[in-house]
Each structure stands twice: as C-alpha cells, then as structure tokens.
A protein has these predicted regions:
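Sec-dependent bacterial lipoprotein signal peptides
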Residues: 1-16
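Bacterial Sec-dependent N-terminal signal peptides
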Residues: 15-66, 134-143, 147
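Solvent-exposed, low-complexity, repeat-rich "mucin-like" stalks and linkers
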Residues: 66-104
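Serine/threonine-rich, repeat-prone extracellular segments and beta-strand-based repeat modules
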Residues: 78, 102-138
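Structural signature of tandem-repeat unit edges
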Residues: 80, 156-170, 180-193, 202-215, ...
Length: 447
C-alpha cells in the first residue's frame, strides 16, 4: 500500500513539471504563410523552361515632354461610310511632336474623335481629333445609302449619281424603284446580285456593272425610258431574266459570253434597240423575248436548242437573221417554235441555226421578202404551214432523208415556190415522201 502511494505522488509531480515547461509531446505541422506582394514567385509563361531568360514585352518609354502638335501619319482604312455605320479607326496612325523636339506615335480612340455622325449623308464630313488640347482634322464621306449585312436596302432620293460602297454584295428588290432623280449608278466589284424591279420606272440613264455580277432579278429596268445602253459583256450572268428591259429605251445591250438563256419578254417593246449578238453559249430564247423591239439585225449561234414561239414577233424593222459559230449536236429536239418571225415584213434574209431539228408552223407567215431559204441538214421535221403564205421562191434542203411532215395536208411552202433543190441521191425519195410529193414537179437535184 505504501508503495502505491509513492508511485501516485511521483506521477503528479511529473505532470506539474510538464505544464510549467510546456513541453509538447508531438510538434504540430504549421500551414505555410501566404505570400506577400513582394514575396510572390513569378509565374513562368508557357513555352519557357527552367534556366531560360524570360522575354519581356517592349514598353514605350514614358514621355516627359509636352505634346505640341498632332500629325496624321496614315488615315483610317475606312473613310467611306453608309447610313447607320459606326466609326472605325482601324489603320489610323497619329504622330505627336513634343517639346523635346522629338516625334512619337500617339494612341487614338473613338473618345478622342468629335464631329462623327452617320445618320445623314455628307459628301465631306470633317472629323476632329482632340488629344491633350491639340487637334488635327480629317475628312470622311457618308453615302446616302443604307447597307445591312452586305445588302443595299435603302437609297435616299435627291441624288443624281450614286457610287456603291465596297462592302455591298447584293441590291435588294425595288431599291431604286420610282426614283426620278437618279441618273447614274456605279456598282462595286464584289456585287453579285440585283433584286427584282430594282430600277423599275426610274430615271436611270447609265449603270456601270461589276465583273462579279452573277444574278439578275426580273423586271429590273422595266419602264426605264431614259436608259440608253446596258453593257453586261464583262459580267458573269447566265440568264437574262424575264421582263428585264421591257419598255426601256435601250439602243444597245451587250451580253456576256457566260449567258445561256434569254427569258420570257426580256427585251420586249425595246423600240430603240437596233442590233443584238446572241452569245455563243445561249441555248434558249424565251417566249416573246424580242417582241415588238426595234432590232434591225440579229445573230444567232449555231448551237442554240430552243427558240420559243413569237420570240421575234412583230419586229417591223428586222431585216436580217444570220448565224455564226460551231454547230452543237447535243439537243435532239432543238426547235424553232411557231410564229417566231411573224409580223416582220422587212425581213429579207433568214438563216436557220444549223443545230435546229424541228421547224414550227407559221414561222414567217405574211413575209414576202425572204425569197431564198436553206433548210439545214439536221432538220428532221417541218410542221404544218411552216413557210406557207410567204414570198419564198427557192428552197435548198440539205438533208438526204426528207424531213418528216404532219399527217394530212401539208402546206410547208407556198404554191408559188419555183424550186426545191435536194441532194442528188435523194431526189426520188423527196418526190415520193409524204407532204413533199405535193411539190414533186418542183423538186430537183442540187447542182
């Protein structure tokens, strides 16, 4: 018992001694203290490795001198604006002359510019740059047009000449419709399309078309009675669209080599138009395309495949239709449809394109001046009364096989025809063929 009491007393003395000296049994792990601003390690940029010196960006030296004068080293790239556009200072470079006699580049931002507004058109709008109580001026232009996402959507009236800005890719429909002040429009390179009725019933006299133009809407120059000339020859259009020049007073229309079709009534009632060369790649001429036009002569390509009915109906001044170019044999149904040249009393020469295979009825009904006619070798069918009631006297048929005729009575040529000359080896075939046998006594071999 005595030994237990001694042991407990010893333990109590040991605990009291430890508390006085604060001796920890195990030292705690301290959390690292946060870095101060001066002690933070520098972050290494990507791409650097340990031991390589870091490249620091060059900084402009702080200029202690006073700015005395501003000069424009380079104007902004954009000095031509349209209605509603925001200020664009890209490319603008200013130089400052300082009191130490040295020049330094000066940074400029929109806050330094006064006088800018694109809410109204301005031929010469002066803008002022204000920096450290020094000023310099430059001029911009605000055109009387509005452009949205590359589309010309509005043109203010009261201007006789408009130059489109370089960012226009399309002209919206009816933009110039009814504008009786406009005389000239210069279209920008980069423009690819013009919407329908864009110049309908306007006073436009001249249009400069870009080489990038590819698409035309319908009725673009309908009722433009002051337009004298349309040069589309260097464009990329493939279709001359319906009604594009109806009632326009164009005297000359130049078409591009890319053109493939002339649509319905494209040049109808163009009374002052004198001459047209149809480009070699054109395969299609639509219904009444040249109806009541003033053309005197027309050249058709030998590769054409379709001339729709009444294409040249009632062209009273038309005297000559000639052909040119290589022959295309790609259209087995290539045809000149009915009544194409009816109402052309002065027509004295008619050449049929050598690609044609079918001749429609009544092609030159009523004409008395076409006396000689050659039917090309590819023609395989001649329809009812194709050349009846005309002044045709001499016919040359190149095909060895007689072209087919409709069943029943055939009035392919007038009763007054004097000779039908065919290949020598085919004379008998023609004399006995249906329809042709009616003219047997006038059929003879070509010399």
């Amino acid at each position: 018992m005595k030994s237990k009491i001694v042991f407990l007393v010893c333990i109590m003395f040991f605990i009291v001694a430890c508390e006085k000296e604060q001796i920890p049994l195990e030292k705690p792990i301290e959390a690292p203290a946060p870095f101060s601003n001066d002690e933070k390690p520098e972050e290494k940029p990507e791409g650097t490795t340990e031991g390589q010196p870091e490249e620091k960006p060059e900084q402009q030296p702080e200029i202690q001198a006073t700015l005395e004068k501003l000069s424009i080293a380079q104007l902004p790239h954009k000095t031509f604006y349209t209605l509603g556009e925001e200020l664009n200072l890209n490319g603008f470079q200013l130089t400052g002359l300082y009191s130490d006699g040295k020049e330094y580049p000066v940074t400029v931002s929109p806050e330094h510019i006064s006088g800018f507004s694109s809410e109204a058109p301005a031929e010469h709008l002066e803008l002022t740059v204000n920096i450290e109580e020094r000023q310099v001026n430059f001029i911009i232009q605000v055109a009387p047009v509005r452009v949205r996402e590359g589309v010309l959507t509005e043109v203010l009236k009261g201007y006789s000449e408009i130059t489109l800005p370089p960012n226009v890719t399309a002209i919206a429909p009816q933009v110039f419709q009814g504008n009786r002040q406009i005389a000239k429009v210069i279209m920008n390179e980069g423009l690819t399309s013009i919407g329908e009725r864009a110049f309908f019933n306007s006073s436009i006299q001249e249009v400069v078309f870009p080489s990038t133009l590819k698409q035309l809407g319908q009725d673009i120059f309908y009722y433009c009675n002051q337009l004298k000339r349309a040069d589309l020859s260097h464009t990329q259009i493939t279709r001359l669209t319906s009604g594009i020049f109806v009632y326009a007073d164009v005297e000359e229309v130049l078409l591009p080599s890319t053109l493939q079709s002339i649509e319905v009534q494209a040049l109808m009632k163009t009374g002052k138009l004198k001459s047209v060369v149809i480009p070699q790649n054109v395969k299609y001429i639509g219904q009444e395309a040249f109806r009541e036009s003033g053309i005197i002569n027309v050249q058709l390509p030998n590769g054409i495949s379709t001339i729709v009915d009444r294409a040249f109906y009632y062209c009273p001044n038309l005297t000559e239709v000639s052909t040119y170019g290589p022959v295309s044999d790609n259209a087995p149904d290539a045809m000149i449809q009915a009544y194409c040249f009816v109402g052309c009393p002065n027509l004295s020469r008619l050449e049929i394109p050598r690609s044609i295979r079918i001749l429609g009825q009544g092609l030159i009904t009523g004409n008395q001046k076409v006396n000689k006619l050659t039917i090309p070798s590819r023609v395989v069918r001649i329809n009812f009364s194709a050349f009846d009631n005309t002044g045709v006297k001499e016919v040359i048929v190149e095909a060895v096989t007689p072209p087919a005729t409709p069943e029943g009575e055939w009035y392919g040529f007038p009763k007054t025809v004097t000779s039908i000359l065919v290949p020598a080896q085919a004379v008998e075939a023609y004399k006995t063929a249906r329809g042709w046998n009616k003219f047997a006594e006038k059929i003879a071999a070509r010399p």
